[in-house]
């Protein structure tokens, strides 16, 4: 197996693949007579293709153990996919650059408390992978007709592990 070290999730390193979703004081302002702070426009939700619409769903995922064998990644050519945790539990985010229609070398990130991600349209990524305990997520992605899922199975799997 090919070793794949986990690194902390950061805005700058994740930027080529989408958005890190977390409170950002630079994009905040008070609403509701000052009783609420709005953290505004934290992710670009993308939907395209026939009858495209934005979906909001809830997921409850069981935890995975590290080290983890990564055999497959997927992508959604017709829309982005956001995962926003409802708990402070970390989760693993694996992404890979596109190299001629196939995934390149994957990168593994672990989220910090309260961080979510929006994986941009057509970006190769791993499946939702909660760590340490069962976790619930709000998922924002695309509905509508058309094929919005491509999968790629690696010839040689990766072993995702803490550095």
From Swiss-Prot:
Record-listed E.C. numbers: 4.3.2.3
Keywords: Lyase, Plasmid, Purine metabolism
Cofactor(s) annotated in UniProt: Ni(2+)
A GO MF term: ureidoglycolate hydrolase activity
Gene3D superfamilies according to UniProt: Ureidoglycolate hydrolase
Enzyme class: lyase
One Pfam entry name: Ureidogly_lyase
Record bears the keyword Lyase: yes
CDD domains noted in UniProt: cupin_UAH
Pathway assignment: Nitrogen metabolism; (S)-allantoin degradation
Catalyzed reactions per annotation: (S)-ureidoglycolate = urea + glyoxylate
Record's keyword annotation contains Aminoacyl-tRNA synthetase: no
Functional note: Catalyzes the catabolism of the allantoin degradation intermediate (S)-ureidoglycolate, generating urea and glyoxylate. Involved in the utilization of allantoin as nitrogen source.
Family label: Belongs to the ureidoglycolate lyase family.
Quaternary state and interactors: Homodimer.
Protein name: Ureidoglycolate lyase 2
Organism: Rhizobium meliloti (strain 1021) (Ensifer meliloti)
Organism lineage: Bacteria, Pseudomonadati, Pseudomonadota, Alphaproteobacteria, Hyphomicrobiales
